[in-house]
Amino acid sequence: MGVTKKPDLTDPVLRAKLAKGMGHNYYGEPAWPNDLLYIFPVVIFGTIACNVGLAVLEPSMIGEPANPFATPLEILPEWYFFPVFQILRTVPNKLLGVLLMAAVPAGLLTVPFLENVNKFQNPFRRPVATTVFLFGTVVALWLGIGAALPIDKSLTLGLF
């Protein structure tokens, strides 16, 4: 096992180097400007060039080409819009439907404040927030599944 020599902090040469910020690792290569100005832009440009090259050389079709003369019977939104689409579909009044759609993010904003005084992170020790979360999840799943069905079976999911 080798003996390591500890630095002598009373040495005036070492103190001068430490005052300049050179320390014991003054022989290394600094990150600025070498890495930040030369290596990082090359890596970023290379990544972008690879992505553009792959997109140009091998374009992939996303879905099937649209045919404006053959539209589907019922146009559905993307899957993450199914619950609010179902709200709009089932509520007869348009203004009420839009207000209910606006109530979804407003309700999500109020969930953290339900048990503001309760500082526990364990969901079993926060019964109100856990109940609201589970109820909202069940309602969102119910509305999402119902939006994929025809309008006459959408509220009951074809079960009743």
Curated annotation (Swiss-Prot):
Gene3D superfamilies: plastocyanin oxidoreductase, Single helix bin. It holds the Pfam family Cytochrom_B_C. InterPro entries: Cyt_b/b6_C, Cyt_b/b6_C_sf, Cyt_b6/f_cplx_suIV, Cytochrome_b_C_euk/bac. It is a multi-pass membrane protein. It is found in: Plastid, Chloroplast thylakoid membrane. The chain crosses the membrane at residues 36-56, 95-115, 131-151. PROSITE patterns: CYTB_CTER. GO terms for cellular component: chloroplast thylakoid membrane; mitochondrion. Keywords: Chloroplast, Electron transport, Membrane, Photosynthesis, Plastid, Thylakoid, Transmembrane, Transmembrane helix, Transport. Its main location: plastid. GO terms for biological process: mitochondrial electron transport, ubiquinol to cytochrome c; photosynthetic electron transport chain. GO terms for molecular function: electron transporter, transferring electrons within cytochrome b6/f complex of photosystem II activity; electron transporter, transferring electrons within the cyclic electron transport pathway of photosynthesis activity; ubiquinol-cytochrome-c reductase activity. Component of the cytochrome b6-f complex, which mediates electron transfer between photosystem II (PSII) and photosystem I (PSI), cyclic electron flow around PSI, and state transitions. HAMAP family: Cytb6_f_subIV (MF_01344). The 4 large subunits of the cytochrome b6-f complex are cytochrome b6, subunit IV (17 kDa polypeptide, petD), cytochrome f and the Rieske protein, while the 4 small subunits are petG, petL, petM and petN. The complex functions as a dimer. Belongs to the cytochrome b family. PetD subfamily. This is Cytochrome b6-f complex subunit 4. It comes from Spirogyra maxima (Green alga). The lineage of its organism: Eukaryota, Viridiplantae, Streptophyta, Zygnematophyceae, Zygnematophycidae. The gene is petD.
